[in-house]
Amino acid sequence: MSEAPVYTLKQLAELLQVEVQGNIETPISGVEDISQAQPHHIAFLDNEKYSSFLKNTKAGAIILSRSQAMQHAHLKKNFLITNESPSLTFQKCIELFIEPVTSGFPGIHPTAVIHPTARIEKNVTIEPYVVISQHAHIGSDTYIGAGSVIGAHSVLGANCLIHPKVVIRERVLMGNRVVVQPGAVLGSCGFGYITNAFGHHKPLKHLGYVIVGDDVEIGANTTIDRGRFKNTVIHEGTKIDNQVQVAHHVEIGKHSIIVAQAGIAGSTKIGEHVIIGGQTGITGHISIADHVIMIAQTGVTKSITSPGIYGGAPARPYQETHRLIAKIRNLPKTEERLSKLEKQVRDLSTPSLAEIPSEI
């Protein structure tokens, strides 16, 4: 790798289109977390939970918002003031200092097995031991990592990044700039069986497609099944974390986020800009409205028709869930109070010796 470049804060401000507060000639040669940064590093502050690090950080400069810069101006630090998310500006800064890591296998590796009917566009990188099946189509500038498999009649758009050991089975249609992390499987048969007269479970053929829109990202070891007859669709801009299960004929709307270990059962429709928290389970054949947020470990058993934050199992509006959790937390105290009340009632209903007649 080449030596890291050095920029002054003035140069960084021009490149990032931000404002400098402090010494514009401060040299910066790297990026680092705010808690670990040294004088040659630039760091960022986005979440105010970490503002305690700002006072003692050794960073040569910190990227933050205008309101944060005003709040912490008394610290006399070097600030780069951004009008967008500090984290997003910091990401642009990373790209100035850190070179992309490549495998060192440019072009099409000789160990790759490519069917004669497959169509490979220009500037495609195909790493060792990749298999590309008949009538597959790989778009220009796409990168396919070692050991990956592209199934028959599948289409990958331009500028896709397929990491090693990915399986894209037959009948997967992928848009442009899609990223798939290692171990993911797209296009598996759905979990569909029919039980015969002898009680044996017979698998059903799944003939649908998996359709993935532009700018979708799919995490490691995530699985997306194709439908029996209809398609499983992931619309543009959606980001899916690791170890997520998307069942047959699910549709996920644009720009949604699905966090690790969530599971969506068959034929469910997820709206746009939905956030599904980790380990959330969503039953099949329901729909989720746009702009719904499900906190971690939510259990969704019926359709959600209104935007908002939901939690619990079964899912309910978060404020209701929060109140229910508070009541459950107070159950031991409630039980103790109830026991005392029951004892008082028993004492009141039991006559004293003075009240019992001495003669009958």
Swiss-Prot record:
Active site: 248 (proton acceptor)
Keyword Transmembrane (UniProt): no
The enzyme's E.C. designation: 2.3.1.191
Keywords on record: Acyltransferase, Lipid A biosynthesis, Lipid biosynthesis, Lipid metabolism, Repeat, Transferase
CDD domains documented for this protein: LbH_LpxD
Major enzyme class: transferase
Described function: Catalyzes the N-acylation of UDP-3-O-acylglucosamine using 3-hydroxyacyl-ACP as the acyl donor. Is involved in the biosynthesis of lipid A, a phosphorylated glycolipid that anchors the lipopolysaccharide to the outer membrane of the cell.
Family: Belongs to the transferase hexapeptide repeat family. LpxD subfamily.
Entry protein name: UDP-3-O-acylglucosamine N-acyltransferase
Organism: Chlamydia pneumoniae
